[in-house]
Curated annotation (Swiss-Prot):
InterPro entries: Kinase-pyrophosphorylase, PSRP
The keyword Transferase appears for this protein: yes
EC number: 2.7.11.33, 2.7.4.28
Binding locations of ADP: G161, V162, S163, R164, S165, G166, K167, T168
Protein name: Putative phosphoenolpyruvate synthase regulatory protein
Keywords (A to Z) from UniProt: Kinase, Nucleotide-binding, Serine/threonine-protein kinase, Transferase
Amino acid sequence: MSQPVERSPASTRTVFFVSDGTGITAETFGHSVLTQFELRFKQVRLPFIDTPDKAYDALRKINETFAADGQRPIIFSTLVKADLSSIVRQSQGMHMDLIQTFVEPLEQELGVKSTHTIGRSHTSTDSEEYKNRIEAINFSLAHDDGQSHKNLSAADVILVGVSRSGKTPTSLFLAMQYGIKAANYPLIPDDFEREKLPGGLQAYKHKIFGLSIAADRLAEIRNERLPGSKYAALENCRYEVNEAERMMRREGIRWMSSTTKSIEEIAATILQEIKLDPPIKD
């Protein structure tokens, strides 16, 4: 079996994300792959490459980068039209064509041609999926940080945890990415003294998922916001984290630590644990 060729990596490698739409798909896939390498990357986005003139302009930019860097740029491309893709393929770059790699084999397997519609997943602003996402975002904003107890029956998931444990960004990610209606409520010292969940949540315990965090990391985050305060003191953070975890265990609430997890990993865990199945996007 052949072995990978070992090269002396340069300090920074240029990466182009080329698309005839927004470039979100190319960028998301590219990021997932690039994180597997302990190298620095300079990222260049080239969205809306939907005419030959724009494709030749992208070709010029890639070749200029090759001349300046002395090494091939890496290209992640989602150009649907073959004529545009063939232009970019003439560049002095290492070309990763996601359409050819995945769509064409699927056409053969499924026995049907794809629609080859440019930017399809990001332009269906009138679709039911888009409306659901907007509704979910509005719901999550209205139910952020315990602002409202109204209409909790409509929530898909209710996140609880100490302040600054990642509840708000996770709620908004679930809403924006999956159309999940996520409310979130802070667990505070008053709740620990009463040994009860925040008012109104008991009836929806089956929807609750908890987020915890390492006390030292929590202290770091809180000190960025309120340096030197009791709120950010390590001793207080330890108390809140310990009490919150004790409450979640007592109430039988599923929970996880967000300390070393990305928002994407947290969201994926929640979807799996709560048994939520986000719809396949158009």
